[in-house]
Each structure stands twice: as C-alpha cells, then as structure tokens.
C-alpha cells in the first residue's frame, strides 16, 4: 500500500543521498556542456505526475487501452503547442529521445541498405547521422560529408558526394557546429539528386523557436529535435513536418508506433507540453538571445587569450576551442576544468591529430549558464578563469590555479543558483 507522504529519503537513503549529491553538484558547478540545460520546476512536476502510471498505446482518439481520456488531452496539448511554436503542419510528440525520433524518420522514408548522406561525427555530426558504430551506419549505407579547414560546411563537397552516391536521404544538422546551416542550399542539393532532406535541429531548436536561427521546416521534408538542450524541457524527442505530403505523415505515425515504440511516456509528453508553453512566452526570446550573446562574449575572450576558436566564432549557443596550437588535449582540459567545478566536454576539432577519446579541443555551450542568470560580464569573467586553468596546464602552479578558480566558481554559483529558494 502507498501513502502520499512516502519519501525516497525514508525508504532508500543510499539513492536519496545520490539525488542530493547530484543536486549539490548542479548548484556548485558551472554547466557548459552544450547539449545540457536546466528544466523548470514545472517541467519536473509534470514528469513526476500520475501520468507515469498510464499506458496509452496509439494516438489521441485512437488508443488500444481504456482510460486515456486525459492522456488524450495532454498529448493533443503538446501537439498543438509544438505546431504553434515551430509553424509545423504535422507533429509527433511520442519519441522517447532524439535518436528514436531519427530512427523513426529513417524507417518511414527509406529501406535497409539505402544510401544516406550525413555529417561526419568527427566534423560535428551526430551518431545517428550515419556513424558506423550507430544503427544509422549499420542498417543503411552511410556516406559522410565534413567541414573545411575553416570549420564551415563545404556545400560543394556535399553536392559532389550527393551526385556520386545518389542518396535516398540527406541528413542536415549537427552536434558541434557553431555557424548557420543553409537549409535552402541543402534542399537544393537534395532535389538535384531526388533525395529526401531530413533535418535534425536538436541543438538549435530553442533558438529556432525564438526566431533567432533559420527554421528548417520550410525546406525539409521532415525535421526532428530533442526537447531538452536549448529548448530546456524534459529529455525526449519530437518529429515535425510541413512538407504537405499526407503519405509521409502517415508513414511517420506508424514508424513511431507501432514500428519503433510501444506505449508513449505520457508523463514526459505532459512535461513537453509545459516546455512548449514556456517557449511561447515573450521572455523566452530574451533568454535565447542572451544564450547567443553569452556564447559570442566567451568566444572573444578565448581569442584574446590566444586560443583558436573553430570557424573563428559562433552564431548559435556553442563553440569549439582548439588546442592544437598549444599542444594540449581536450581530455586534459576537460579534467582540469572539471576539478575547478567547470563542466565541459572534450571534442574533436578540424585536422585533429588525437584519437576520438582524447581529442584536441573542447565544446562549450551557454544554455545552462544563461538559464541560471549569467550575463555577458559574468561569462567573460568565466571564460577568463577557464583560460587561466588552461594556461596553467602542466605547469608548477596548475593545482593552485585550479583551487583559486574553484573558489571563484563556488562564489558565483552561490550568487546565481539554478533553483533559487
């Protein structure tokens, strides 16, 4: 039997301690991983709702279980809000993740063994864009395009590869690209070879929702995104389209359910509905504008301190810092910054001489720090502290600099908490 006053703290103190420790870690560390963000208490409330108990196989108005009348309301709310937010004609809110959303798109549009053309993981793409270790590179014949030495997509290279391999589907989108993708150009290439254009906008969905980054929906046959990252919602996936082809919409529906998934996570869909409502608020655009401003401000500090920034800047929420010139590794930088309570991730950079698990760079993103209230002056100061740590790597004063930086980090985290009381 359950009672509403039951707590994890009373029942499972080991798990409770891990939860408390993670809460403290998030409050006392500066989060700069570009794919992470802080969900609002409202989003987390929805995730912890009684909808976690409900099975709802099927779609609103056409379920395989009874008792879904309120699940229907929740899912339709999420669908309608996502349509309004992105200007989409078709939306599926059921994918459990971005990767599962992508798998559903492949399953709807192409067959096993068909050729896909996507961005190389080592050049800023994603595992599901054709990497050989992913289902997308195992089930399909994947051909990869990359970026130039300047860190920009080489559209002529994309076109030439498309003409050579005649893909059934071209994937546009990224996990580590700091410039604006020309969606219209990618569609032009896709049309030239008779391919579908599939855009994974997971990293920039929040910026697109705010009107600060080009919307791919007018150009792509299908678009996917995660609902966390810049959007700032729960961990989950989303499929959208405005291509006007009802047959594609039907294929997408059946590719999600029953082909790839069974019952949807209604509590997560409820949290998505909250996230979309938050993204429709006027202040959301201001938040996303500050995300970009903060990224640009940090870039300038790194450049002033002698560090190379891939593509020489950023037009979104992230940027890559290359340490090839300094002879440092991303792995060492990641570890040293982590000791100072600054969380980043090591990342491959153009012409990287290091192995993928070592790398010669880091990826830095500003959605999380911006959400906790960091302004341009704060992030300039933060970037300076990061450069102090990087400058000291391998030197006698390394540990001292890390310790001093950690104290500064703790002070600013106390001033700007993630979840103020």
Swiss-Prot record:
One of its GO terms (cellular component) is cytosol. It is found in: Cytoplasm. Its EC number is 2.1.2.1. The record marks 228 as: Plays an important role in substrate specificity. The modification N6-(pyridoxal phosphate)lysine is found at residue 229. The keyword Amino-acid biosynthesis applies. Pfam families: SHMT. Its cofactor is pyridoxal 5'-phosphate. Pathway: One-carbon metabolism; tetrahydrofolate interconversion; Amino-acid biosynthesis; glycine biosynthesis; glycine from L-serine: step 1/1. Belongs to the SHMT family. It catalyses: (6R)-5,10-methylene-5,6,7,8-tetrahydrofolate + glycine + H2O = (6S)-5,6,7,8-tetrahydrofolate + L-serine. One of its GO terms (molecular function) is pyridoxal phosphate binding. The keyword Zinc does not apply. This is Serine hydroxymethyltransferase.
């Amino acid at each position: 039997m359950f009672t509403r006053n039951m707590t994890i703290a009373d029942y499972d103190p080991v798990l409770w301690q891990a939860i408390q420790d993670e809460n403290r870690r998030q409050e006392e560390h500066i989060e700069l991983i570009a794919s992470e963000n802080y969900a609002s208490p409202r989003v987390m409330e929805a995730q912890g709702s009684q909808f976690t108990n409900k099975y709802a196989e099927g779609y609103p108005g056409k379920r395989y279980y009874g008792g879904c009348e309120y699940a229907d309301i929740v899912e339709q709310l999420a669908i309608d809000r996502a349509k309004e937010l992105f200007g989409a004609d078709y939306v599926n809110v059921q994918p459990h993740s971005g990767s599962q959303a992508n798998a559903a798109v492949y399953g709807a549009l192409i067959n096993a063994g068909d050729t896909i053309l996507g961005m190389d993981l080592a050049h800023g793409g994603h595992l599901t864009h054709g990497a050989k270790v992913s289902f997308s590179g195992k089930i399909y014949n994947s051909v990869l395009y990359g970026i130039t030495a300047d860190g920009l997509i080489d559209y002529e290279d994309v076109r030439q590869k498309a003409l050579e391999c005649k893909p059934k589907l071209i994937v546009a989108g990224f996990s580590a690209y700091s410039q604006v993708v020309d969606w219209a150009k990618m569609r032009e290439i896709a049309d030239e070879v008779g391919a579908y254009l599939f855009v994974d906008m997971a990293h920039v969905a929040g910026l697109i929702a705010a009107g600060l980054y080009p919307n791919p929906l007018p150009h792509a046959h299908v678009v996917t995104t995660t609902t966390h990252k810049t959007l700032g919602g729960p961990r989950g996936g989303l499929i959208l389209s405005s291509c006007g082809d009802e047959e594609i919409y039907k294929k997408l529906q059946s590719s999600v359910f029953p082909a790839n998934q069974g019952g949807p996570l209604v509590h997560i869909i409820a949290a998505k509905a909250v996230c979309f409502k938050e993204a429709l608020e006027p202040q959301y655009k201001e938040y996303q504008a500050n995300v970009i401003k903060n990224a640009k401000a940090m870039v300038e500090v790194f450049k002033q301190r002698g560090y190379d920034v891939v593509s020489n800047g950023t037009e979104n929420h992230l940027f890559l810092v290359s340490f090839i010139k300094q002879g440092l590794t991303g792995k060492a930088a990641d570890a040293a910054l982590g000791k100072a309570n600054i969380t980043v991730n090591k990342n491959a950079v153009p012409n990287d001489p290091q192995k993928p698990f070592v790398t010669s760079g880091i990826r830095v993103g500003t959605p999380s720090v911006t959400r906790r209230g960091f302004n341009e002056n704060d992030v300039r100061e933060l970037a300076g502290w990061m450069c102090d740590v990087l400058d000291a790597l391998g030197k006698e004063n390394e540990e001292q600099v890390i310790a001093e930086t950690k104290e500064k980090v703790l002070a600013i985290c106390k001033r700007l908490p993630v979840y103020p009381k």
